[in-house]
Amino acid sequence: MENTQHSLPIDHVIDIGDNRYIRVWETKPKNKETKRNNTIVIASGFARRMDHFAGLAEYLANNGFRVIRYDSLNHVGLSSGEIKQFSMSVGKHSLLTVIDWLKERNINNIGLIASSLSARIAYEVAAEIDLSFLITAVGVVNLRSTLEKALKYDYLQMEVNTIPEDLIFEGHNLGSKVFVTDCFENNWDSLDSTINKICELDIPFIAFTSDGDDWVCQHEVKHLVSNVKSDKKKIYSLVGSSHDLGENLVVLRNFYQSMTKAAVSLDRQLVELVDEIIEPNFEDLTVITVNERRLKNKIENEIINRLADRVLASV
């Protein structure tokens, strides 16, 4: 294996106009002896940045995959916008922009890994874009139900102008009026709306649930998968996990292993998980995680300095 264990991801910027951009990180394959058919795109969950998935990117790269991560617009991370302006449609636009950008670079064979709220976005578009396969983990299938469980109240039953604007979801201000208005106007809220979008999916598909997930009902995931057209589909359980896949190192390692096994299997057009993968050691994971955090901080400081220069130039 090539000695690239501690190399940083390649930093790309997709210019979408109006001084707005999507930041993308590319991790090259670190096992050049294993040839994979697909590039993996990781869509981070709500309030998760792409550097939060450094470990998963390392697992996949060590098993021969090129890995693409990105931060959504109007979200936490390095792309344009603030999370209080986030909506599901903005997340959809961000994902589609990244997919289009890859295809413009002649990267056409793409497998998508999406977790939590981003999985609902993946379900929205996966049947309409040219993916090789789809993997979801603790994927939201009934957005209204998940929000009610997470927020302890069904705010979507209220008139939009009466919903508190400062709802905190996953430690961040949801920007509830923007988010809820988009949910209703674009039919993001119900299980039926999710099934209507994903039912024509005809590519290999693996969904992972967690047996301790209080936010996503496993029977609803099973109902969704049963309605998917593809004859290559399967559900697996992340035993011992909750909705938080990073709650401890045991759960996190199981998540990395499971996603990587699924990616290797689906790259071969199989839904039965492979038995063996190459695992990076703990020291390498620690170093790359720290290095990516430093890269994130460096880019954030550069962004702040550019904004300050613009303000000074306008005075």
From Swiss-Prot:
It comes from Photobacterium leiognathi. It comes from the Bacteria. This is Acyl transferase. InterPro entries: AB_hydrolase_fold, LuxD. Pfam families: Acyl_transf_2. The active site is at S116 (charge relay system), D213 (charge relay system), H243 (charge relay system). Signal peptide: none annotated. One of its GO terms (molecular function) is acyltransferase activity, transferring groups other than amino-acyl groups. Acyl transferase is part of the fatty acid reductase system required for aldehyde biosynthesis; it produces fatty acids for the luminescent reaction. The gene is luxD. GO terms for biological process: bioluminescence; fatty acid metabolic process. Belongs to the LuxD family. Pathway: Lipid metabolism; fatty acid reduction for biolumincescence. Its EC number is 2.3.1.-. Keywords: Acyltransferase, Luminescence, Transferase. Transmembrane segments: none annotated.
